[in-house]
Amino acid sequence: MNTRVLRLTTTRPPAIERRVVQTSMLSLVLLVAAWCSISIGAAKSDLLFPIKLIGEWIASGQNQSSIMMIVSEIRLPRVILAILIGAALAVSGASLQGVCRNPLADPGLLGISSGAAVGAVTVIIFANSLSVPQFIQPYLIPIAAFVGAAITTFTIYRLAQVNGTVQIATLLLAGVAINAMGGAIIGAFSYVADDQSLRLMTFWMMGSLASATWFMVAISAPVLILGMYFIHKKRTEINLLLLGEANARYVGVDVDRVKHHLLWLNAIVVGVAVACSGIIGFIGLVVPHILRVST
């Protein structure tokens, strides 16, 4: 009996080539979005602003016109910080989905963002009664948000430990409980806040990059970049955790140590991101799924 083997050919490029093409396209989209964000605004809209800005820097070494000051001192820090925070939240969401083996896991689900919000709202409510040095006051809310995220992560981690092992189900339940508790605390603060504090609370919790400065970029960029780098170094362990903790241990992964490191790396990254921009949801949940579908 003769059997025929049909070989199906496809024009689909190899995986590496396809990934290069997709990365190039996404980078181009990011570049176009950043270019438009720098060029378009309430003061004046001109798609040639970045070119003019570079030309003026080269010619005089400083920004002469007011519109150039707006571009270089307001729009550019916001764009850079938006890119860093978006990337950090996406990387954090992808790693938490791997650690928890839950496609719906994100920093908000585990209560990290809620803890940061409680810290920031606490400072907003009691700002008038706090005596702090003048130079720290502009950064008091970001510092409180980061501390709140760190305390929340420590609490969730301790609650999730059973006999020295972090249980994923307990971790998720503790995160949901802390998230609900944080919402209740914020609601109570909203009830006792005056009009000015209530407006500031609402504005901060909506998420905004209006307070972005070069100083904030200089402080947050190294932390976010290093945090994303160390999370990316754990990509092999995260992929193995997706197969199950037993299988990961079978191939030599120290599961408890990896989960410990990833939880604290995510706490640092998300804490800094939320401290700079307020609560920005949806990115950490959806972006990893979009990239998985596209690749």
Language model feature labels by segment:
Residues 2-295:
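Alpha-helical transmembrane segments in inner-membrane proteins
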